[in-house]
């Protein structure tokens, strides 16, 4: 059976890039590579709400046999 693997097609589909291209993309002088402040603020607020809500629950271990955990 003949191997008909096309490396160029694979690179396009897999988004394979060279180290030099990554260095160029991640250069510290790149403008617009990060999130906006509004987006970052929203993510922090949502994360804070989720952490706050889940930390207020009374969690019981799954194997707990105490009355307070069963009811």
Swiss-Prot record:
Keywords: Antibiotic, Antimicrobial, Bacteriocin, Lantibiotic, Secreted, Thioether bond. One of its GO terms (biological process) is defense response to bacterium. Residues 1-33 form a propeptide. One of its GO terms (molecular function) is signaling receptor binding. Its main location: secreted. There is a cross-link at residues 35-39 (Lanthionine (Ser-Cys)). One of its GO terms (cellular component) is extracellular region. It is found in: Secreted. Contains LL-lanthionine and DL-beta-methyllanthionine, when coepressed in E.coli with the flavecin synthetase FlvM2. There is a cross-link at residues 54-60, 62-65, 66-69 (Beta-methyllanthionine (Thr-Cys)). Disulfide bonds: none annotated. The modification 2,3-didehydroalanine (Ser) is found at residue 36. NCBIfam families: lant_II_LchA2. Lanthionine-containing peptide antibiotic (lantibiotic) that is probably active on Gram-positive bacteria, since its analog [Del1]Flvbeta.c shows antibacterial activity against M.luteus. This activity is not synergistically enhanced by [Del2]Flvalpha.a, an analog of Flvalpha.a, which is encoded by the same operon than Flvbeta.c. The bactericidal activity of lantibiotics is based on depolarization of energized bacterial cytoplasmic membranes, initiated by the formation of aqueous transmembrane pores. This is Lantibiotic Flvbeta.c. The gene is FlvA2.c.
């Amino acid at each position: 059976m003949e191997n008909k693997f096309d490396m160029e097609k694979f690179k396009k589909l897999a988004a394979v890039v060279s180290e030099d291209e990554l260095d160029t993309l991640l250069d510290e002088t790149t403008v617009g590579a990060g999130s906006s402040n509004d987006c970052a603020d929203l993510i922090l607020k949502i994360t804070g709400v989720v952490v706050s809500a889940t930390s207020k629950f009374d969690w019981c271990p799954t194997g707990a046999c105490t009355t307070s955990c069963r009811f």
